[in-house]
C-alpha cells in the first residue's frame, strides 16, 4: 500500500515533499494531471470528473489514501467525491481507502482552531479585524471556501481572496523569475487596493505558489506571516494515520512520479525548487 498525492500539475510537489519529510518510510505515488492543468479556470463538473479519475488511478496503483494537493480540487470536488463516489469505490476495491484535501488543515492553521469548532455568533461588532489575504486560482476564489469556513470559526478575521488566473500556468511553463515577480507584485498590489492596505497575514492558496514563496515574501511587507499549506497538511496527515491504523501507508520508502502529460524531466524552475533532476513517468 502507499500514499497517493494528486495535483493538476507540479504544485503538489510542495505538499509531497513535506509529507515525505514527515513520513519518510511510507511509499508515495505522485500523480500530476498535466494534460489538463491548470484546474483553476475549469467548470466545476470538469474538476470533479478529473479529480475522480486521478483518485481512481492512484487507488488502482495501490494507494490506501489520496491527498488532494490542489486547492481547486479540494474546494470543488472533495466533499462531493467523499459523499457520492468514494463509498462505492471503496466497496468495489474491498479495502479501506479515503480521500483528504488540504483546505481543512490550512483553515485550522489560519484560525488556530480545530475543524470541528464553530464559534458562537454573538452579533456584536468586532472592532479590530485581522486581515487575511488568500492568493488562489479563480476556481478556489469563486468557491469562497476560505471566507465561509474561516468566518464560521473566527469573526475577528476578515478574509480577502485575490484570484491569480495566470500564475499556476506560468509556473508549469517554467516562466522566468522577473516575469513571475512582476505577476506576483501585480496581484499583491491589486489586493492592497481592494483592502485599502496590505493584509496582516497571507495564505498561498494554490500549492504551485509555494514554489515561488520567496517572491510573495518580497512583494508583501517584510515579516508578513505566510500560512504554509505543506507544513499544515503534513501535521494533519501524521495525526490522521495515528488515528486510522487500518490505512496502510507502506514501509518501503518508495517514490513514484506520474504524469498524464509528457513524461520526462520537469522545467528548471521546478527542478531548482526540488533540488535536482526530477523525471515523471507516463500515468
Curated annotation (Swiss-Prot):
The active site is at 70 (proton donor/acceptor), 206 (proton donor/acceptor). GO terms for biological process: cell wall organization; peptidoglycan biosynthetic process; regulation of cell shape. PROSITE patterns: ASP_GLU_RACEMASE_1. Its EC number is 5.1.1.3. InterPro entries: Asp/Glu/hydantoin_racemase, Asp/Glu_race, Asp/Glu_racemase_AS_1, Glu_race. The keyword Lyase does not apply. One of its GO terms (molecular function) is glutamate racemase activity. Provides the (R)-glutamate required for cell wall biosynthesis. It catalyses: L-glutamate = D-glutamate. Belongs to the aspartate/glutamate racemases family. The keyword Ubl conjugation does not apply. Substrate binds at residues 7-8, 39-40, 71-72, 207-208. This is Glutamate racemase. The lineage of its organism: Bacteria, Pseudomonadati, Pseudomonadota, Alphaproteobacteria, Caulobacterales. Pathway: Cell wall biogenesis; peptidoglycan biosynthesis. Keywords: Cell shape, Cell wall biogenesis/degradation, Isomerase, Peptidoglycan synthesis. The gene is murI.
